[in-house]
Every structure is written in structure tokens, then in C-alpha cells.
Amino acid sequence: MSRPAGGSRSQTIATWLALLGGPLGLHRFYLHGVGDRWGWSLWPPTLVGAYGVQRMRTLGQDDQIAWLLIPLLGLVIAATMLTAIVYGLTPDARWKTRFDPSGDAVSSPWLNVIGAVAALALGATALIASTAFMAQRFFEYQALQRSARPPAPADQTNSQRLRP
């Protein structure tokens, strides 16, 4: 995808947009323009995940649809935090070749590093929380399914049940 007319893009701004507005694709729109397909492709899973959060707040934690929707938001957040890390730690020469050929954009190396560190903390938190949430709900669902089954007759022992 090509960069929009008007040229120079700051590495610092791109890093912080990915950190603060990543799930909405703001960093992609800044670098590639409003017509960027990848930027718009972040909206559906973000909105679906936010809807899952809203469902859980409204209907409680027993809502099984929310179990499926909420991890999408966590995964989008983790993915965009990875993008912020990549942007923040990209070498200056490579960044200037790709996004700032005129060299006009001002970037602050320390703000890039701080943004990358913050993105690492936030992304790791989102990924771990999403994984823990999915695993907890999966095991709760399994326990619910086991408790719904009728118990085995009391007069049979384990050895009798295993015989053909």
C-alpha cells in the first residue's frame, strides 16, 4: 500500500498512535491514508469484542456469547501493541526510507522507546488476560457439560462398566 500524498511521517507519532489508538487502526490511517484496508479491518473485531464486554456487563458472566466475543478484543489489542513495538524500535534509516524520504518529520528516540515499553506491558497484559479468560471459560463450560450428564447407576463398579 502506498503512502498518501504529503510525505513525511513521524516514527514517534506512529508509535503512539499504535499504542493509544491501535485497535481503531489510527496508526495505519496516519501512515497509509484513510483508504487503508488493514486499518479498516481492525474495526470489526474491535467492535465485536467491545460488544462482548458490554454483554458481559449487562447479562453477567454466564453469557456464553460474551465468552467468545471478548477474547477478540484482547487479541486485537495484543496485535496492535506488537505493531507499536515494531514501529518504535525500527531503525531510523529504515523508517526514513519507507515513511520519511524527505527527512522532514521529527522523531524523538526516547519517546519511541517509552512507547515501545508501554506497548510491551499493555500487549502482554492483554494477551495473558485473554488467554486466561478463554481457558477459564473453556474449563467452566466443560464442568457444566459434565454436571448436566446423568450419573452412572450406583450398582455398577468401574470394572463392570468397562467390560464389553
Segments and roles (model prediction):
Residues 17-29:
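N-terminal signal-anchor/start-transfer transmembrane helix
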